[in-house]
């Protein structure tokens, strides 16, 4: 069984992440390519922003399930936890959501509780290095979230 552990489907707030923004044309000289351009190929499903095509692409590649990571990372984007839940309802048994949590946000611990207990999320996703300013994963501000 193949499980994609960090899928980013073409759905609502995911579409606001840089992953879905149009790519600049590749420079002719490969020496000018950036890290995200090396080996890049067009992704028709991502460009179409079509969830059914995304699920078909999973099927075509033998991917049975996928983990969806929420994100609450200040300047780098938010993937809404309620939207992750919507996907679990639209495609039952297909996706395992992890709640995006920012420990600096008021109500972070309550959001962990809501997502795990009320919506059946399987874990949490934190992006300490993407926060503004960045944190280390063992910063004491995370303790109440980790304890939950």
Predicted regions and their residues:
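Helix-coil boundary/capping segments in enzymes
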Residues: 1-148
């Amino acid at each position: 069984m193949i499980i994609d552990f960090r899928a980013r489907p073409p759905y609502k707030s995911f579409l606001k992440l840089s992953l879905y923004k149009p790519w600049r044309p590749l420079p002719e000289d490969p020496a000018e390519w950036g890290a995200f351009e090396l080996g890049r190929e067009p992704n028709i499903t991502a460009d179409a922003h079509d969830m059914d095509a995304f699920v078909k692409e999973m099927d075509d590649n033998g991917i049975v399930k996928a983990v969806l990571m929420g994100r609450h990372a200040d300047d780098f984007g938010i993937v809404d936890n309620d939207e992750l839940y919507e996907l679990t309802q639209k495609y039952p048994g297909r996706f395992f959501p992890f709640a995006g949590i920012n420990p600096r946000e008021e109500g972070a611990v309550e959001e962990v509780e809501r997502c795990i207990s009320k919506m059946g999320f399987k874990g949490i996703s934190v992006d300490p290095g993407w926060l503004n300013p960045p944190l280390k994963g063992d910063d004491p501000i995370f303790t109440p979230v980790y304890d939950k």
